[in-house]
Structures are given as structure tokens and as C-alpha cells.
């Protein structure tokens, strides 16, 4: 009754909810029907609320679940939890997408950016008198096996030089693939078109018409121009300006449209998609990155890493943006594509594989910029299944290292990092970590009946199903690691777990793994951390400073004793009665 009165009094244009699609609005409508109390969610009284069913689909190697939807008439309803990428660009980003795609506000909030790009392409086609196909019917052109191997290569990825590096600049191509489509006129109808102005695609032997602008470049060019304009405005606005948040949200919405447009170019069901155009874009991208590498090396820089649309370069004596500006200018000259300096790292660490430390991993690194901020990729803090307490500890270790005043002071920050780790170890052992911080989550990749050996997420979902809570394929399940069978306790069960059943060893393992990712570049391996924590051994100095078989002399002990005592001194923390107590 109160909600109905509020809606009539204020008559809002927009209802912004969390879980409104899947829970609150369906529940309120159900109560309204059962009790006979009208609930005017719609402005148009003669229309019924539109319900759209939930669905599960497979995309990019993972199963995704989209909850049911509640659409209103006369006013908009957006569910922040069920809206696509709402956490990235918020309400301002949704408004910007609606302006760009001409899709209804409630629709554009819930569909993927790919659907937005498809709508923009159809608008371009209608404006230019091009018929829009109902379904894609154009098949891929026949290829020999050699042609397929040559064309189907994707982006260029180098193996980075592992370890710590100082004064490294990260140079990125601005919206590389969309820029390639616009600059080289890559579109389904221009690829393979024999015209006097056609140009040859590197490596592929395919030609692209350059005389008449294609449908895809016509769609993307205004979007690219608008995003660059927002970027330029953001660079001139002070941090306190309220417009920064709005411009950033709109720019992020543009970014997702531009990121998706490349994938849609090769999507089998895209109306204006064509695999040959997709392959041409990646070929141009590989050529551009190689030219960028050659430009940097010709100017005396060392290329530490290259990854699809960016490269990391270093040169003795180069530490300021003016030192790297000649590289940017030369890359623009040689490629014809826009580039920008993502930032200059005081130091950056490229990490090796966990399976074989001799092998580098392309997208597993972390570094600290000159302004003190940091960037992480491929480590535990970026994974959605990592407990929040582990994430906080890993970021605290990184902040500890980031406090070094210079590259040479990094080893001196190691005792403080070990102290943080030991304090976290003791907090876990003594039951001082809130259960909320230990919750892990994983996606349910199959229906429960399809598992031959249930995963951890499946075991937690089975527990929930026994109390009537059904988890669908593609949804995430939250749980705690416990000892014994079944090894997990579903977090959404009504009864909390017995504190003595928490699997401390599993969380200790996760803790050491996360700490190892940060401390490994300083020479500390996981076995060393294991020994330090389990045996309560002290820290004497950076690993490698003392040969394994060399005896510890009295002078060495005296020089390292302050560091040892500092690392072994845990911070005092009062126990709390509302937190669990470890059983062992």
C-alpha cells in the first residue's frame, strides 16, 4: 500500500532496483494479486507488466545465466544486479548506450554490447539504403589448409622477460581493432572487392577496397571520435570536477561497444559479420605491433613484452614521459594508428608460470606507476573466485612494496611484507578472520544432474537444492571450504557452519599462493614462505644473499637481527566473539 502511494505521489520516470528483476518486483506483484491490492508499477494503467524468462547460454568458453526480466510501461525499470556491465558504467553509461544504439532504455541496460553494435550497424544500413538481412546467410569462403593456418592466428602475443624491471613505459594503441577497421576500411562488403584502389592485407593475400567507405567503418568512426573527445576532456578536468564521473561512465560505455565490435565482426550469427574481415583486422594488428617493436628498437629501447595492442619498453636513462615521446611519435608515423602512454612504471614484475618457473606467462604481471598507483593482471586479486580476505592481503602486500622510495629499496620492504603475511597467518589460525572474508564463489558450469564428479560449486548447489533453493547453470555459488565430506558449506544456507569445520589448511594454501605471486620477483618462493609460516622461522635477508651451505656467522646475525625481530613481531588484535574459532 505504501509503495503504491509513493509511486502515485512522486510518479518517477525510473525505478532503479537491486534484484528487482528476479526477486523483489515479482514478489510484490504476486502479493498484489493474492491480496487484491493494486500496485501501479506501470504508468499506463491498461498495460500489464512485461515478464521475460531467464535464459542460459554459452559464450567465450563459459556458461552465462541471465535472470528473468521485469519491463514496465510508461516508466523504466533497471535492475542493477541483472543489468549488463552496470557495475562498470552505471546509470550514465546506460543512458549513453540508449542514445548511441537507439534501443529502449530497459532493453539496452540488459543486452550485451554486441547487441548494441548490431543495432548501430542496422541504423547505418537503413540510413545509407542498405538492406538489413533477417538472418546471416553468407558462408565463409573456401580455404586451403595452409591459408587457414596463415589467416587464423589472432593477435600477436610475445613471451615477456620475467622478473623485476624499473622505469618501464606501457604504450597502448587507442582502440586498436576499431581504429584498424576505420583506418583500413575493413568491412564485410569491402573485403575481397576488386577495385583499382584496393590494398593488400599483410600476410593474407586478401584485398580491401579503399574507394568507398564500408558500413562498419561508417558505424565506428563517430564512436571513435566521441570517445577520443571524452578522453581529451577528462585530461583537462580537475579531480574534483563533478563532470569527471559522468564523462568516465560514458567513455567506459563507448569502450565496451568498441571492444565488442571486433568480436561481432567474426561472429557466425552477426548480420554484418564476415570471418575474412575478422582475419584481416588481426593481420593488420600483428603488422602494427611488429612495426611498433621495430620503431622502439631503432630508437635504442628494449621491448620487454608485447600483448595484442600494447608493448612495454625500457631504456637506460629514460624515466619521464618526454623520454618516451619520440617512441610514440615514431609508432604513429609507421603505423598510421593512434597510440597513447598508458603510464610509466617505477617498477613492474612479469611473473612465470606456476607449473614451470622457466616459462613466462603473457598476461600475469603487476607494477607500480610513478604516481604510486598500481596495475595487476592475472593474479589472485583479479580472480572472482578468490575470497575477499585473500584479495585484501595480496593488495596489502603490493601496497607494502609500493611504498619503496626507489627501485633499489624494494628488498628493504620485504621484512614488512613478511610481517603482514605472518599477522594474517596468525589471524587465520586464531579465528580472527570474519567468515564473510573467507567466502569463495564459483560458476556452475552444468546442470546438477550432468556432473559425474561434482565440483565444489556443484556440491554447494546440491546443499542449497535440499532446502528448496535452486541454482541454475551459469549462476555463481558461494561457499566456505570445510574439512571432511563434502568439503564445502554453501554460504546461503540458513544455518552457519560449525567454526571447527573450517578447512584452515586450504585457506593457508590460498594465502601462501597469493603471497608468493607478489613476493616471488624478490626471490621468495612458495616453499620458503611455507617454511617461514609453518616453522615460524625468521627472516634474515633477501633470499640469495646467503649461499645455502654457508654458515651464519655472528656478524651476519647481528646485521640481520633487527629485520628478523621486526618480521617476527605480530600486531596485537583483540579477539572478537562474533568470529569463528579454529578447531586446530
Task: Enumerate the predicted regions with their spans.
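Conserved alpha/beta enzyme-core scaffolds, especially Rossmann-like or related mixed alpha/beta domains
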Residues: 7-15, 71-84, 99-108, 271-272, ...
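Active-site cores of enzymes that catalyze phosphoryl transfer or operate on phosphate-rich substrates
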Residues: 1, 79, 211-270
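Gly-rich Lys/Arg/Thr-decorated short loops/hinges at beta-loop-alpha junctions or inter-strand turns
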Residues: 264-283
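Extended catalytic-interface subdomain
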Residues: 65-130
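Conserved DEDDh/DEDDy metal-dependent 3′-5′ exonuclease domain
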Residues: 1-91
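DNA-dependent DNA polymerase catalytic subunits
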Residues: 104-193, 242, 246, 250, ...
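Cytochrome P450 catalytic domain signature, combining two hallmark sequence patches
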Residues: 37-43, 92-98, 185-196
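Conserved phosphoryl-transfer catalytic core
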Residues: 194-207, 211-212
Amino acid at each position: 500500500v505504501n509503495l503504491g502511494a509513493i509511486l502515485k505521489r512522486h510518479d518517477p520516470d525510473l525505478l532503479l532496483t537491486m534484484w528487482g528483476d528476479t526477486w523483489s518486483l515479482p514478489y510484490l506483484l504476486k502479493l498484489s494479486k493474492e491480496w487484491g491490492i493494486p500496485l501501479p508499477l506501470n504508468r499506463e494503467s491498461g498495460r500489464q507488466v512485461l515478464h521475460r524468462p531467464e535464459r542460459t547460454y554459452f559464450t567465450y568458453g563459459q556458461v552465462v545465466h541471465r535472470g528473468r526480466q521485469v519491463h514496465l510501461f510508461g516508466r523504466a525499470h533497471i535492475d542493477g544486479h541483472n543489468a549488463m556491465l552496470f557495475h562498470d558504467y552505471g546509470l550514465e553509461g546506460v543512458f549513453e548506450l540508449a542514445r548511441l544504439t537507439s534501443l529502449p532504455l530497459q532493453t539496452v541496460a540488459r543486452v550485451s554490447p554486441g547487441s548494441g553494435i548490431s543495432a548501430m550497424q542496422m541504423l547505418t544500413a537503413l540510413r545509407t539504403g542498405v538492406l538489413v538481412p533477417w538472418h546471416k546467410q553468407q558462408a565463409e569462403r573456401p580455404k586451403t589448409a595452409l591459408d587457414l593456418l596463415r589467416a587464423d592466428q589472432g593477435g600477436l602475443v610475445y613471451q615477456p622477460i620475467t622478473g623485476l624491471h624499473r622505469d618501464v613505459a606501457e604504450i597502448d594503441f587507442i582502440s586498436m581493432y576499431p581504429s584498424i577497421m576505420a583506418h583500413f576500411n575493413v568491412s564485410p562488403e569491402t573485403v575481397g572487392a576488386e577495385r583499382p584502389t584496393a590494398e593488400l592485407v599483410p600476410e593474407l593475400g586478401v584485398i580491401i577496397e579503399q574507394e568507398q567507405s564500408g558500413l562498419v567503418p561508417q558505424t565506428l568512426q563517430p564512436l571513435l571520435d566521441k570517445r577520443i573527445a571524452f578522453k581529451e576532456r577528462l585530461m583537462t578536468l580537475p579531480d574534483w570536477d563533478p563532470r569527471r564521473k559522468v564523462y568516465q561512465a560514458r567513455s567506459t560505455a563507448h569502450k565496451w561497444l568498441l571492444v565488442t565490435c571486433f568480436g561481432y565482426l567474426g561472429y557466425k550469427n552477426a548480420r554484418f559479420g564476415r570471418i575474412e574481415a575478422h582475419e584481416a583486422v588481426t593481420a593488420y594488428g600483428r603488422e602494427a605491433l611488429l612495426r611498433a617493436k621495430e620503431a622502439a628498437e631503432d630508437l635504442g629501447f628494449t621491448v620487454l613484452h608485447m600483448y595484442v595492442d600494447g608493448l612495454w619498453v625500457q631504456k637506460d636513462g629514460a624515466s619521464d614521459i618526454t623520454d618516451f615521446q619520440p617512441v610514440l611519435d615514431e609508432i604513429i608515423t609507421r603505423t598510421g594508428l593512434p597510440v597513447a602512454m598508458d603510464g610509466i612504471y617505477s617498477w613492474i614484475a612479469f611473473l612465470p608460470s606456476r607449473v614451470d618457473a622457466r616459462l613466462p606467462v603473457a598476461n600475469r604481471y603487476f607494477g607500480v606507476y610513478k604516481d604510486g598507483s598500481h596495475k595487476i593482471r592475472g593474479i589472485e586479486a583479479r580472480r572472482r573466485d578468490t575470497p575477499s580476505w585473500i584479495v585484501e592481503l595480496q593488495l596489502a602486500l603490493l601496497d607494502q612494496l609500493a611504498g619503496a622510495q626507489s627501485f633499489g629499496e624494494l628488498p628493504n620492504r620485504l621484512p614488512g611484507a613478511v610481517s603482514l603475511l605472518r599477522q594474517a597467518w596468525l589471524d587465520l589460525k586464531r579465528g580472527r578472520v570474519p567468515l564473510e572474508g573467507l567466502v569463495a564463489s564459483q560458476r556452475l558450469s552444468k546442470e546438477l544432474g550432468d556432473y559425474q564428479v561434482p565440483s565444489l560449486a556443484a556440491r554447494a548447489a546440491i546443499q542449497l537444492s535440499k532446502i528448496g533453493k535452486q541454482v541454475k547453470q551459469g549462476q555463481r555459488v558461494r561457499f566456505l571450504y570445510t574439512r571432511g565430506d563434502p568439503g564445502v558449506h554453501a554460504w546461503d544456507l540458513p544455518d552457519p557452519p560449525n567454526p571447527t569445520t573450517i578447512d584452515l589448511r586450504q585457506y593457508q594454501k590460498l594465502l601462501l599462493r597469493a603471497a608468493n605471486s607478489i613476493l616471488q620477483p624478490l626471490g621468495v618462493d612458495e616453499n620458503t614462505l611455507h617454511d617461514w609460516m609453518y616453522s615460524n622461522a625468521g627472516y634474515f635477508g633477501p633470499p640469495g644473499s646467503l649461499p645455502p651451505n654457508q654458515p651464519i656467522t655472528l656478524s651476519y646475525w647481528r646485521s640481520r637481527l633487527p629485520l628478523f625481530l621486526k618480521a617476527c613481531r605480530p600486531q596485537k588484535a583483540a579477539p572478537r566473539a562474533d568470529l569463528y574459532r579454529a578447531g586446530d
